[in-house]
């Protein structure tokens, strides 16, 4: 019985799942929008939102915790220097999931996951790239 077991397995073992979400979280922080399957996007929220909450209070201990979870110093820098101050007044809900149809190969539902309130210049570039 799987009572009280939260999170989706996604047909992967635990180390693969952990590595995948670590990479996806780093990509989302770096680019502020990524395209993935809808199910992975929903799971990714559970990884990224606590990282941003951690970045709202800058300390050496919090930076080390963020590094332990992402293993990427560049991502930790962006979290604490840009995203933490940007979301200082927001009490959660830092990501938005936008459904974008089905993948051509296997009809998997796809979605964009983006950080709320990302700069307008980046949004304009993404729209042009999509067209």
From Swiss-Prot:
Family annotation (Gene3D superfamilies): Ribosomal protein L17
* PROSITE patterns per record: RIBOSOMAL_L17
- Specify the domain of life of the species encoding this protein: Bacteria
Task: Give the UniProt keywords, A-Z.
Answer: Ribonucleoprotein, Ribosomal protein
InterPro entries according to UniProt: Ribosomal_bL17 (IPR000456), Ribosomal_bL17_CS (IPR047859), Ribosomal_bL17_sf (IPR036373)
GO CC terms of this entry: cytosolic large ribosomal subunit
Family annotation (SUPFAM superfamilies):
Prokaryotic ribosomal protein L17
- Which one GO biological process term can you cite for this protein? translation
A single Gene Ontology MF term assigned here is:
structural constituent of ribosome
Q: Does the keyword Hydrolase apply?
A: no
**Keyword Ribonucleoprotein carried by entry:** yes
Task: Name the protein family.
Answer: Belongs to the bacterial ribosomal protein bL17 family.
The cross-references to HAMAP family, in alphabetical order and at most eight, read: Ribosomal_bL17
Instruction: Describe its partners and assembly state.
Output: Part of the 50S ribosomal subunit. Contacts protein L32.
Q: What is this protein called?
A: Large ribosomal subunit protein bL17
What phylogenetic lineage does the species belong to?
Bacteria, Pseudomonadati, Pseudomonadota, Gammaproteobacteria, Alteromonadales
């Amino acid at each position: 019985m799987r009572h009280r077991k939260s999170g989706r397995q996604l047909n992967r073992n635990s180390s693969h799942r952990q590595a995948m979400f670590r990479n996806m979280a780093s990509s989302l922080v770096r680019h502020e929008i990524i395209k993935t399957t809808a199910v992975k996007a929903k799971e990714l929220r559970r990884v990224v939102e606590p990282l941003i909450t951690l970045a709202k209070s800058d300390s050496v201990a919090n930076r080390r915790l963020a590094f332990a979870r992402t293993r990427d110093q560049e991502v930790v820098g962006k979290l604490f220097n840009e995203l933490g101050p940007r979301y200082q007044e927001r009490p959660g809900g830092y990501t938005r999931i936008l459904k974008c149809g089905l993948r051509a190969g296997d009809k998997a539902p796809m979605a964009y996951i983006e950080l709320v309130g990302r700069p307008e210049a980046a949004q304009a570039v993404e729209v042009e790239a999509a067209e």
